[in-house]
Structures are given as structure tokens and as C-alpha cells.
Amino acid sequence: MKIVLHPAAVADLSAAGDWYERQRPGLGVDLIVEIERALEVIAESPTAWPRWPDAPTELEIRRVLLPRFPFALPYLIQSNGIVVLAVAHEKRRPGYWLRRAKRRKR
């Protein structure tokens, strides 16, 4: 299934990658590699992952948790593909990205 990253998710990813890279060279690259793997898993089986607990029931929003980093990838399943809504830190600003899904609802 086709996957696209919401433009704001690209910004999330860039900010997180830059932060980790400043903490230790190579760590930002590790984050990006882990996210790429998660995207492959989502594409292979988008409905295998749990629904986002606080998402509106009318939206098909699911999530993948990254095993090594404290991030989740919330994604919206649509008839024409999957939209990754955010690279969301698990402990910061819960649900800040939900408005991105509401704007994309089709």
C-alpha cells in the first residue's frame, strides 16, 4: 500500500533526527533507519497494528511504536493509501497531531 508522510510529519522527523544526531553522531541516522523499517512494516500489513487509543472512532488511525526510541508513528488508513500523521514523542504533547487527520479525512 502507498505510504506518504504528512508534511508536518516530515518536519517532526527532521527535528527528532537532528536532536539525536547532536546527542551522539550516528544516533539520528539510527532513528531514521528505525522509522524506515516501521514504514515497511506498516505498508505490508497496515491493519495489524492497534488503533490509536484517543483517536476519533470515525477515523482509521493506527500506530506503530518504535522499539528503540520513544516515538510512535500514528497513521491514517484511507482508500487511496496511508498517511503517516506524525513522528510523535510518546511523552510530549499527546494528540497534538490529531488535527492533521481531521483535515485529511475523505
Q: How would you label these PLM feature ranges?
A:
Residues M1-E34:
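Arg/Lys-rich, positively charged N-terminal/basic patches that mediate binding to nucleic acids
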Residues A15, S45-A48, R93, R100:
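Acidic, low-complexity intrinsically disordered regions
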Residues A16-Y20, L39-I42, P46:
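Hydrophobic recognition helices of helix-based DNA-binding modules
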Residues E21, L59-E60, A88-E90:
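Short alpha-helical segments used as structural interaction elements across diverse proteins
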Residues V29-D30, P50-P53, Y96:
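Short, hydrophobic secondary-structure boundary micro-motifs
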Residues R37, E44-I82:
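Basic/aromatic recognition patch in beta-strand/loop cores that engages polyanionic ligands
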Residues L66-R106:
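Enriched for short, Lys/Arg-rich terminal
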